[in-house]
Each structure stands twice: as C-alpha cells, then as structure tokens.
C-alpha cells in the first residue's frame, strides 16, 4: 500500500483467521480495496471463475503473486501418488493455472514464491523440492516467452506459513534451510 497498491485481490482456500483478517482490515484502513475470493488455485475452472467474477468491478489485473504451498514430508519410497499430488497441486498446478490465466492480461509482474529446497533437494522433501523446481522452471519458460516472471527461492519463514510450526522449523534447520 505504501508503494501504491490500491486494489488487492486475494485468492485463498479458506476464510482468513482472526489475525489474517486484522491484517486485511489494516490494509483497508490504509486506503486499499481488498477483495477475498475463495478458490483452490489447483482447480483451473474455479480459479478462472473467481478471478473473472472479482475483476468485473476491479481495475485490470497487473500483478500476480503466487504463495500457495503445503508440506507432506517423508522419504520418497514412502510417498504415494496422493501425497505427491497434495504438495504438487497448490504449488505446481496452481502456478501453471495462474500462468494460463495470466495470458489474458497485460501483466507487469508474475512472482512465484519458491524454496531453496528446489536446488538443495533436502532429504524427506522430494515432493516439495519437485514442486518448487517446477516454479523455477516456469519462471524461465515465461521469460523465454517474453513474459514477466520472477521465482524467489526462500528459506523457511519463522513466523508465518508452512514452516511456522516448531517441528517444521527444526526439520528444515537440520537440513540447512534457515
């Protein structure tokens, strides 16, 4: 908001918790129009419907920031297809669906929140590493097409997101991800 954002469309699978709702209200108090649309980014038709509906009374879409993700860590031989899909769906499928949706818009930015796991390949996080490697490659693909793209390889966030749980932080720390 301090840098000029006046309209924000947030996609989420669920309603915000109290602390998150307070942050959204703070943005509104600063003069930002905040619209929350419930949709799973891995469901392309639900995603398109949510975005198209929201944009009917909003300015054109200019930037996409993809932050979705989840963890389901285990050794590769213990991961079945459903556990792999659980991690790939929000990150990889969601990113691809956002990419396809973005082709209908003149974007200034397409930002993907990836992880250092994509190139460190930590033990027990093969599905998560693969999902994040997809984000990195999607950014390269978009750049090859002349489209905006940036993939940021984050470490663990201590106070928010998937790794905020102490058990996850300890696991990531043992793997050298800080």
Regions found by a protein language model. Give the residues of each.
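4′-phosphopantetheine-dependent carrier domains
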Residues: 1-178
């Amino acid at each position: 908001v301090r840098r000029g954002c006046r309209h924000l469309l947030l996609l989420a699978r669920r309603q915000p918790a109290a602390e998150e709702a307070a942050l959204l209200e703070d943005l509104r108090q600063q003069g930002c129009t905040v619209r929350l649309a419930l949709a799973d980014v891995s469901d392309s038709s639900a995603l398109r419907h949510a975005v198209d509906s929201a944009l009917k009374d909003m300015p054109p879409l200019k930037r996409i920031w993809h932050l979705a993700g989840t963890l389901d860590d285990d050794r590769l031989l213990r991961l079945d297809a459903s556990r792999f899909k659980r991690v790939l769906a929000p990150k990889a499928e969601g990113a691809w669906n956002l990419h396809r949706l973005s082709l209908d818009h003149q974007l200034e930015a397409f930002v993907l929140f990836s992880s250092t796991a994509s190139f460190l390949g930590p033990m027990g996080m093969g599905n998560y590493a693969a999902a994040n490697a997809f984000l990195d490659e999607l950014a390269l693909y978009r750049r090859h097409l002349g489209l905006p793209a940036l993939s940021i390889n984050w470490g663990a966030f201590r106070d928010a997101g998937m790794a905020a749980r102490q058990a996850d932080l300890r696991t990531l720390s043992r793997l050298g991800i800080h």
